[in-house]
């Protein structure tokens, strides 16, 4: 394998051999996808339970545009902290409309909402995933460092992810800039035995262990919404 490929994506990845402007154009050309995180206001559990069937029906109506749908929970799994949606929608206006019409948001349940342009590297959806009955964790974080830093660690990063194989549930992928061109963060979903396994995954990941993420990264326990 050439040294150029040893510093990049692995064979079989549609990004294999791409870098610089060619890689940015690859992301620009992909259909827009969105990671939407909604965090509940305190004391709204009863309202959430009452409106949850409406939310499920709302999400189901989007059919194949739903990449994933689930809820943030406490580490012990007892308390629901919010909801996340991973959607393929035409543009930011469509993402904003999706959120504006979402039943729990319309009811004023959320304390904070985050909408991120995102790209699913796996091209799979939640319905395609065979569940293993373990715990799920969403790992997110904004990236820091220079493009040179990420090029230096990219092959190790991709090889590390490949070693985890089917621990990734149905997606992993970068948070993108508004136009989709630039890699500014990450969002990935893992199924692992427990929180300590999720912490180990993150702490040993090549970008993370070399300071590639800002300090406000998060590992949050997650459950399927369907």
Question: Which ranges hold each PLM region?
Answer:
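Conserved, structured core segments of small domains
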Residues: 2-226
């Amino acid at each position: 394998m050439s040294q150029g490929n040893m510093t990049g994506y692995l064979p079989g990845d549609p990004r294999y051999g791409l870098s610089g402007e060619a890689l940015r154009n690859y992301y620009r050309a992909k259909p827009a996808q969105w990671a939407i995180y909604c965090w509940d206001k305190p004391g709204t559990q009863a309202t959430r339970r009452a409106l949850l069937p409406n939310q499920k029906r709302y999400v189901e109506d989007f059919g194949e545009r739903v990449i994933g749908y689930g809820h943030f929970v406490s580490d012990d799994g007892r308390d629901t902290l919010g909801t996340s949606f991973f959607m393929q929608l035409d543009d930011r206006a469509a993402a904003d409309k999706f959120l504006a019409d979402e039943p729990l948001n319309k009811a004023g349940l959320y304390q904070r909402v985050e909408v991120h342009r995102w790209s699913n590297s796996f091209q799979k959806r939640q319905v395609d995933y065979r569940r293993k009955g373990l715990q799920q964790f969403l790992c997110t974080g904004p990236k820091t460092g220079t493009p040179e830093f990420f090029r230096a660690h990219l092959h190790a990063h991709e090889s590390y992810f490949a070693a985890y194989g089917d621990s990734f549930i149905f997606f992993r992928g970068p948070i993108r800039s508004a136009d989709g061109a630039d890699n500014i963060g990450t969002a990935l979903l893992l199924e692992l035995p427990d929180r300590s396994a999720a912490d180990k995954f993150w702490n040993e990941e090549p970008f993370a262990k070399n300071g590639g993420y800002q300090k406000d990264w998060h590992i949050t326990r997650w459950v399927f919404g369907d």
